[in-house]
Curated annotation (Swiss-Prot):
Annotated function: Methylates ribosomal protein L11.
MF annotations from Gene Ontology: protein-lysine N-methyltransferase activity
Pfam families: PrmA
Record's protein name: Ribosomal protein L11 methyltransferase
Protein source organism: Synechococcus sp. (strain RCC307)
Gene Ontology CC annotations of this record: cytoplasm
Length: 301
């Protein structure tokens, strides 16, 4: 009796516009695509390739066409065209190797290390603080410049004993990093149920579940989690239009002397967002930039 044929996988590739990368990852996850990676060379971090692996049996041509249409519709509000999608069939063993091979230990800043959960800390990074992440969650794995900007900003701050609010938590990596760096407690929320699940799972991987609470919702839910005791630090790594819409809620989430770290915005969006924040009573500084992306720090004026 002949051996059963090995299943094959579609490998999907595209070069995402920077402002679309995180949203594409989220949309693919919501459409049932759970094996994702973002490839880039350290010397050229802006040249990025998004890759996804899909079981051939589950994704015949009509399903792949529908997927492309859904991604194109998602790109329309951003005013950019979705790049062409490239499809290639891979045998089972090639897929298994390809997916995990693209995730390697990733040092960030001076002290942090993003570590895929199945790997050990390399000897050369033994002194770094490891953040265990399941890249299959597709949310904020740390490769995106805005996530790295936030992580680098966190390690510059004294977080010992602080209370942190993470609005739009994605994978939970920023909240987990806050705990690793000394925060006492993290309260987190996201409007995507997949992100809430990813945050909870990644917190468990890092044995941080007892100090990180996450719920489905936006600023109102986060305010409820804070239970009348505002945070010392607010993290919000979301697109600029969402930051604009959420600005009125920031004063309810932070103590009088608290600080917010806002990213997810492009450098050329920073002036308008800064003016908007200042009009709502915030003192704003552009703390850092990486490529086309910016990080703003806010405190009450």
């Amino acid at each position: 009796m002949p051996a059963a044929a090995q299943p094959s996988w579609w490998r999907l590739e595209l070069e995402p516009p920077g402002e679309l990368e995180e949203s594409l990852l989220w949309r693919l996850e919501s459409l049932g695509v759970h094996r994702l990676a973002v490839r880039f060379r350290p010397e050229a971090p802006e040249q990025r390739t998004l890759q996804a692996w899909l079981p051939e049996v589950d994704w015949p041509e009509p399903e792949r066409v529908a997927l492309a249409e859904a991604l194109a519709q998602m790109a329309e509000p951003f005013g950019v065209a979705l790049p062409s999608l490239r499809w290639e069939l891979q045998p089972e063993e090639d897929w298994a190797l390809s997916w995990k091979r693209h995730w390697q230990p990733d040092p960030v800043g001076q002290r942090l290390l993003i570590l895929p959960a199945w790997l050990q800390v390399p000897a050369e990074h033994a002194e770094r603080l490891a953040l265990l992440i399941d890249p299959g969650s597709a949310f904020g794995t740390g490769s995106h410049p805005t996530t790295r900007l936030c992580l680098e900003a966190l390690e510059k701050r004294s977080l010992t004993g602080s209370r942190v609010a993470d609005l739009g938590c994605g994978s939970g990596i920023l909240g987990i990093a806050s705990l690793v760096l000394g925060a006492r407690e993290v309260l987190a929320s996201d409007t995507d149920s997949l992100a809430v699940r990813a945050t909870a799972e990644n917190a468990a991987l890092n044995q941080a579940g007892a100090h990180l609470q996450v719920q489905l919702g936006s600023a109102d839910v986060l305010q409820q989690l804070l239970a009348g005791a505002p945070a010392d630090l607010l993290l919000c790594n979301i697109l600029a239009p969402v930051l604009t819409a959420l600005t009125p809620a920031f004063s309810e989430l932070l103590t009088a002397r608290g600080e917010g770290l806002l990213s997810g915005l492009l450098v050329d969006q920073a002036p308008a967002l800064t003016a908007h924040l200042e009009a709502h009573g915030w003192r704003v500084t552009t703390e850092a930039e990486q490529g086309r992306w910016a990080l703003l720090a806010i405190q009450r004026a």
